[in-house]
């Protein structure tokens, strides 16, 4: 199990954060697949593997390791995020060999369409920065498809620095956070 401390369980009016449990796996997978369908319908291939039954981030295994966090309102799943305290093989491929010891890797941030348009994605991202503490971690890293200008703008507005693009079509972003 990963060492972390949730500093703030409440992220917005009635929304709260908690580690995902095994019983959440089906609803999380459903949310991720619905998000992938929504992205596909808008011309994006981001997360398209989920539509083929591929789960490169192993949601169930990641839940068991304590890497997945859910955001609920009145017990309804509103959003999800995966925070890896060590790089996956995917992350090592994208980021190379440097900076892993002090980095958290953010994956699979998704908001239920029912709660879209309320700033929940930004609040989840802010929570990942300040609402949870991973000892000795001083930055968050994330990647996204290169062809999503809206997503790139969102991350920049949230204070993430564009670190470059890799040859396979992903843009890399990171943000310094406070470690104690």
Curated annotation (Swiss-Prot):
Record-linked CDD domains: NAT_SF
N-acetyltransferase domain boundaries: 31-180
Signal peptide feature range: none
Keyword Acyltransferase: yes
Pfam families listed in its UniProt record: Acetyltransf_1 (PF00583)
Enzyme Commission number(s) of this protein: 2.3.1.-
SUPFAM superfamilies the UniProt entry points to: Acyl-CoA N-acyltransferases (Nat)
Cited InterPro entries: Acyl_CoA_acyltransferase, Bact_Acetyltransf, GNAT_dom
Keyword vocabulary terms for this entry: Acyltransferase, Transferase
GO-annotated molecular function: acyltransferase activity, transferring groups other than amino-acyl groups
PROSITE patterns: GNAT
Highest rank taxon of the organism: Bacteria
Family designation: Belongs to the acetyltransferase family.
Designated name of the protein: Uncharacterized N-acetyltransferase YesJ
Gene designation: yesJ
